[in-house]
Structure formats: C-alpha cells, structure tokens
C-alpha cells in the first residue's frame, strides 16, 4: 500500500507542476498585466487573438536554436524578451512595463533609457494581442508578443490626447531587442 501511495503522490505532484507551469503562461497571464498597465494610463483593454498567438508561436519556434533577440519584421507590433534560467508571461510583461520610468509624456520621448517596449504595451490603437514562449536549446526562455494594429509610430503618442505634439528624436525604439 505504501508503494501505491507514493506513486499516486508523485503523479499528483507532477500534474500540479505541469498545470502551474502552463498557468503561468496562459493567454490571461499575458493579457492581465498588459491590461493593468493600459488601465493606469486610461487605455482600453486588449483581447487575445489566436491568429497573433499562432504567428508568435511560429516565430518563437524559429528562435529555439539560438534564442536570438531578433525581430520578425512582420506586419505586427512586437516585443521580445529572453532570460535564464526562467521567464514567464508576467516576468516578460513586467520587464516591458518597467520601462515606463523612461517615458516622458510631455516630450513624447524616452529619457535615460529605452521605453519602446512600454509604449507598445500601452499603445491605444493596439487592441489585439498574441504571445508565445519557448525554451531554447541553450536553456534560455524566449517570449514574443505581437500587437495588432502595431504601435510606436513616430510623431504619435501611445495614449492620451489625440492632438499630437511634434516627435522628439530622443525616443529610442528597439531595433534589436
């Protein structure tokens, strides 16, 4: 009876671990922090888009061999993140949202650091989201989120008044991350 109890306990533990690892990377795990950041600046929520998620998964699968922080150059807005030894949905979105401190609304520019990932998260016209996560061959985790319509258009603010002020060239949009 002890052996059977041990087998059952191991199976339950394994099932919980599998469930919790998937639970940390579900569509809602990507949407919730995106929508929380958007809510803070008065922007409406995003919805999950399976077409974007499939696009993201296809591209993430291409990065398994190298975990390269290289944009897909597709038709969507895109944020990338990679980390070792662990990275989940909430962690990736937190990295992007933490760039908020570098975004200066008055000048519509990044001051003291990169903020283009943050501005894409809160871009008012981006209303559909799809993300994917893979573990690369070197053990790093790679996450990509795609946004439709894309954001980060020069001369436009991510949120707020539709009356735009001139673009400040200090806005550093990511080219390789």
From Swiss-Prot:
Membrane spanning residue stretches: none
Supply the SMART domains for this chain.
SCP
Positions where Pyrrolidone carboxylic acid occurs in the chain = 24
Q: Where is the SCP domain?
A: 31-147
Q: What UniProt keywords apply to this chain's record, in alphabetical order?
A: Disulfide bond, Pathogenesis-related protein, Plant defense, Pyrrolidone carboxylic acid, Signal
Disulfide-bond pairs as recorded: none
Ribonucleoprotein among keywords: no
What does the UniProt record tell us about how this protein is modified after translation? Two disulfide bonds are present.
Q: May I ask which residue range the UniProt record assigns to the signal sequence?
A: 1-23
Q: Name one GO cellular component term.
A: extracellular space
Q: GO terms for biological process?
A: defense response; sexual reproduction
Query: What InterPro entries does this protein map onto?
Result: Allrgn_V5/Tpx1_CS, CAP_dom, CAP_sf, CRISP-related, V5_allergen-like
Quote the function comment for this protein: Probably involved in the defense reaction of plants against pathogens.
Family assignment? Belongs to the CRISP family.
The protein's name = Basic form of pathogenesis-related protein 1
Q: Which source organism does the UniProt entry give?
A: Nicotiana tabacum (Common tobacco)
């Amino acid at each position: 009876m002890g052996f059977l109890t041990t087998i059952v306990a191991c199976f339950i533990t394994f099932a919980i671990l599998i469930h919790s690892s998937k639970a940390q990377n579900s569509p809602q795990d990507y949407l919730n922090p995106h929508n929380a950041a958007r809510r803070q600046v008065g922007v409406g929520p995003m919805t999950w888009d399976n077409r974007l998620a499939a696009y993201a998964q296809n591209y993430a699968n291409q990065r398994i061999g190298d975990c390269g922080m290289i944009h897909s150059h597709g038709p969507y807005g895109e944020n990338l993140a990679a980390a070792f030894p662990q990275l989940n949905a909430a962690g990736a979105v937190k990295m992007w949202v933490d760039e908020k401190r570098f975004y200066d609304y008055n000048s519509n520019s990044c001051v003291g650091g990169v903020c283009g990932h943050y501005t894409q998260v809160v871009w008012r016209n981006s209303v559909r989201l799809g993300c994917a996560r893979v573990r690369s061959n070197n053990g790093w985790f790679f996450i990509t989120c795609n946004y439709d319509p894309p954001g980060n258009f020069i001369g436009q603010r991510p949120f707020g008044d539709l009356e735009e002020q001139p673009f400040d060239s200090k806005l550093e949009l990511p080219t390789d991350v």
